């Protein structure tokens, strides 16, 4: 969808939007003045779109250094009377959770929406956590849209709800809702962004113990009012209410879509309660829905949160009712759902014949994820492996903690340079632990954006506590895996304006690291020699690999490489140890695809026979 259409569409216009794009339109309609994020799939497109149109919409937008900062930026804006919107992937809310929990106590003066993009089945994440738990933990209202139209409507509703109760509102999407595309009828711009002014009120905004106790009581009282609001909310709807079936369905979020499709394919009309306002749980509405049923199927992704609520409602009301879902094995406990799963479950409960869809899928070769041709990370992994081999460090003698980013693909052979991963920035913290607990050598990897996000405190910890390991900072001049967003190490901000460029090398030196060297990873010999010296250093050593991502605007494409068949002795070191996707064996010969080759020349440097040269050179 063109950015101009999202920005300039008029009330009643219909746009074909991603769920993520619909959030941007909602932010414009609701008069958001400040928006912030740290990029992370499946929420990344929101920031990409906002980056392109925020200034023209009269909105301030930033790619914050991490999610905690992003939430704090939004919270302060909302406390100043400016509507704010912060968004992040599900694990990002872990990073922001300290301040997120406190915003429930302090509240807001203008609407504040926190979007969490959950990732059932972990398509791009290290875990499958269900962030609906955060609403309960913080005592904040939770809305769950099912499609792009609802994303727009629910988000606009969330700002009104936020201001009615002076609380942030959590909006939960999932990967399919974020990346689903649908027709969205847009509304009008209800208000324009306004300039804020912070009126001091320490008893409200400074939660020391004495004031926090008062804040908590007020929050509990607000939740009592919100329970009534949830019971009466128009975001909760009953479908097929006239059905006389003894089996009903309670569903929320993207999972509702699978229920709808499954019922349609089975030709059934079961009563369905679709919950959009899911916390506080609308117990009164649910009890009313359950009262005419003998059985109910609860459909949700990922944890059985609503199912336990339904069980509690049924038990409290002493309803003679069987509750089916995850807990009794009717539905899978984990991963995202689909129409087939729901059709099978409903068929099993109703006895309706389930029509299995036949799909003739041809066998295709496996395509494991791979670093791009010319990726500087590949060169680094090769150089590190060469340095380790020359120092006779192999197998369990050397540990490779890694981090979140494209370079996590270092787990794949032939590099096999990813042994331990927890979260953003964990490569450095876990290196401290391995250094303290073992005598094994350690080389850890972290990206440039991840270093700014969460790498600086553990690096200071490492220096202060006299740990010993090598840290390789993979500075490819962008936040690559999520789409090439800027970070503080670049001279541009989230709205495309010129900004101060923060030097990673200067930060590392200021942290007390004595061994700091910056290398061009495409120079294999120098990079390998630098890593060897770093491994021999007696304390923390940092090697900064600085070279632009091949997908970025700053990348330079060189002349493609070619193989001299007369010189090539088919040792296959280039295929076996470098594993560049541009290099293949064809009819018993090594071949470099000129359309894929980026001309980085790494293969030329490592060929023992000197059989690789720039294309067209004799």
From Swiss-Prot:
Cofactor: [4Fe-4S] cluster
Catalysed reactions, semicolon-separated: indole-3-pyruvate + 2 oxidized [2Fe-2S]-[ferredoxin] + CoA = (indol-3-yl)acetyl-CoA + 2 reduced [2Fe-2S]-[ferredoxin] + CO2 + H(+)
Binding positions ([4Fe-4S] cluster 2): 580, 597, 600, 603
Keywords from the UniProt entry: 4Fe-4S, Electron transport, Iron, Iron-sulfur, Metal-binding, Oxidoreductase, Repeat, Transport
4Fe-4S ferredoxin-type domain mapped to chain residues: 558-587, 588-617
InterPro entries assigned to the protein according to its UniProt record, in alphabetical order: 4Fe4S_Fe-S-bd, 4Fe4S_Fe_S_CS, HACL1-like, IorA, Pyrv_Fd/Flavodoxin_OxRdtase_N, THDP-binding, TPP_enzyme_TPP-bd, Transketo_C/PFOR_II
The keyword Iron-sulfur is annotated on this UniProt entry: yes
Cofactor binding: number and manner: Binds 2 [4Fe-4S] clusters. In this family the first cluster has a non-standard and varying [4Fe-4S] binding motif CX(2)CX(2)CX(4-5)CP.
Example GO BP: sulfur compound biosynthetic process
Taxonomic superkingdom: Archaea
CDD domains: TPP_IOR_alpha (cd02008), TPP_PYR_PFOR_IOR-alpha_like (cd07034)
EC supergroup of this enzyme: oxidoreductase
Pfam families recorded: Fer4 (PF00037), POR_N (PF01855), TPP_enzyme_C (PF02775)
A GO MF term: indolepyruvate ferredoxin oxidoreductase activity
PROSITE patterns, alphabetized: 4FE4S_FER_1, 4FE4S_FER_2
Residues annotated as binding [4Fe-4S] cluster 1: 568, 571, 574, 607
PANTHER family the UniProt entry points to: 2-HYDROXYACYL-COA LYASE, INDOLEPYRUVATE OXIDOREDUCTASE SUBUNIT IORA
Subunit structure: Heterodimer of the IorA and IorB subunits.
Function: Catalyzes the ferredoxin-dependent oxidative decarboxylation of arylpyruvates.
The name this protein goes by in its record: Indolepyruvate oxidoreductase subunit IorA
Encoding gene (name): iorA
């Amino acid at each position: 969808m063109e950015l101009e259409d999202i920005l300039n569409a008029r009330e009643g216009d219909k746009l074909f939007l991603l769920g993520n794009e619909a959030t941007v339109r909602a932010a414009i309609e609701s008069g958001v003045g400040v928006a912030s994020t740290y990029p992370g799939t499946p929420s990344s497109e929101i920031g990409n779109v906002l980056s392109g149109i925020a200034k023209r919409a009269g909105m301030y937008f930033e790619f914050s250094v991490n999610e905690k900062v992003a939430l704090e930026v939004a919270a302060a804006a909302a406390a100043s009377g400016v509507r704010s919107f912060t968004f992040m992937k599900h694990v990002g809310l872990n990073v922001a959770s300290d301040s997120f929990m406190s915003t429930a106590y302090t509240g807001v003066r203008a609407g504040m929406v926190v979007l969490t993009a959950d990732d059932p089945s972990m398509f791009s994440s290290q875990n499958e956590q269900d962030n609906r738990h955060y609403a309960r933990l913080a005592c904040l209202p939770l809305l769950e849209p099912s499609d792009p139209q609802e994303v727009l409507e629910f988000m606009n509703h969330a700002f009104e709800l936020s201001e009615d109760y002076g609380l942030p509102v959590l909006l939960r999407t999932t990967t399919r809702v974020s990346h689903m595309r649908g027709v969205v009828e847009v509304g009008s711009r209800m208000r324009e962004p306004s300039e804020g002014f912070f009126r001091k009120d320490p008893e409200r905004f400074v939660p020391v113990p004495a004031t926090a106790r008062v804040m908590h009581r007020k929050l509990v009282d607000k939740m009592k009012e919100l329970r009534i609001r949830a019971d009466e909310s128009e975001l909760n709807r009953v479908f097929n209410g006239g059905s006389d079936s003894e089996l009903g369905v309670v569903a929320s979020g993207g999972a509702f879509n699978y229920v709808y499709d499954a019922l349609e394919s089975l030709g059934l009309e079961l009563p369905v309660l679709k919950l959009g306002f899911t916390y506080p749980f609308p117990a009164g509405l649910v009890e009313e829905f359950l009262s005419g049923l003998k059985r109910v199927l609860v459909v949700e992704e990922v944890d059985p949160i609503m199912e336990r609520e339904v069980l509690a409602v049924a038990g409290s009301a002493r309803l003679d009712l069987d509750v089916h879902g995850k807990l009794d094995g009717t539905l899978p406990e984990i991963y995202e759902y689909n129409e087939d799963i729901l059709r099978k479950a409903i068929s099993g409960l109703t006895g309706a014949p389930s029509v299995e869809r036949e799909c003739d899928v041809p066998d295709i070769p496996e395509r494991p994820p791979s670093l791009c041709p010319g990726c500087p990370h590949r060169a680094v992994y090769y150089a590190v492996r060469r340095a380790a081999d020359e120092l006779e460090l192999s197998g369990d003698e050397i540990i490779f903690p890694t981090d979140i980013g494209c370079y996590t693909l270092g787990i794949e052979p032939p590099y096999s340079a990813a042994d331990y991963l927890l979260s953003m920035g964990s490569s450095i913290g876990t290196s401290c632990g391995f250094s303290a607990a073992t005598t094994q050598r350690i080389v850890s990897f972290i990206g440039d954006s991840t270093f700014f996000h969460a790498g600086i405190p553990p690096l200071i910890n490492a220096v202060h506590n006299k740990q010993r390991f090598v840290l390789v900072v993979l500075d490819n001049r962008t936040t690559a895996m999520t789409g090439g967003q800027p970070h503080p190490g670049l001279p541009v901000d989230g709205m495309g304006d010129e900004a101060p460029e923060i030097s990673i090398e200067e930060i590392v030196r200021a942290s007390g690291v004595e061994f700091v060297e910056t290398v061009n990873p495409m120079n294999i010999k120098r990079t390998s020699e630098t890593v060897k010296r770093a491994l021999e250093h007696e304390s923390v050593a940092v090697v900064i690999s600085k070279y632009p991502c091949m997908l970025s605007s700053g990348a330079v494409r060189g002349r493609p490489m070619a193989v001299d068949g007369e010189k090539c002795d088919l040792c296959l070191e280039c295929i076996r140890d470098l594993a560049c996707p541009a290099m293949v064996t064809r009819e018993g010969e090594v071949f470099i695809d000129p359309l894929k080759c980026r001309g980085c020349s790494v293969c030329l440097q490592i060929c023992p026979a000197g059989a690789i040269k720039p294309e067209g050179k004799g």
